[in-house]
Amino acid sequence: MSWYRWDGEDLILACHLQPKASKDEFAGLHGERLKIRLTAPPVEGKANAHLLAFLAGVFGVPKSQVSLESGESNRQKRVRIRRPRQLPALPGLAPRPDA
């Protein structure tokens, strides 16, 4: 299993979140998941909201096009990005096969 997959025009990411980091950044792979460090604390949904905003900015989409599919109260999360406009340089990330 890869840390991402395409579902039509949507990109699904399997993430491992590290809250309360010194800066927001991708930190390589953590097993079969993309490790993401965020400055937000893991309280009252702040880290989740920060994650969605961070990914929206990186993939060039409005925040409304990024949603948490699973892992609301866990470090292991699955996120859907609807029709990403840009792809960051991440290990193994390839454009949609039919693009």
Curated annotation (Swiss-Prot):
Leader sequence segment: none
Pfam families in the record: DUF167
Entry-linked InterPro entries: DUF167, YggU-like_sf
Residue segments, region Disordered: 66-99
One GO term describing the cellular component: cytoplasm
Ranges of biased composition (kind: Basic residues): 76-85
Coiled coil: none
Similarity annotation: Belongs to the UPF0235 family.
Annotated HAMAP family: UPF0235 (MF_00634)
Name used for this protein in its record: UPF0235 protein Avin_03050
Lineage: Bacteria, Pseudomonadati, Pseudomonadota, Gammaproteobacteria, Pseudomonadales
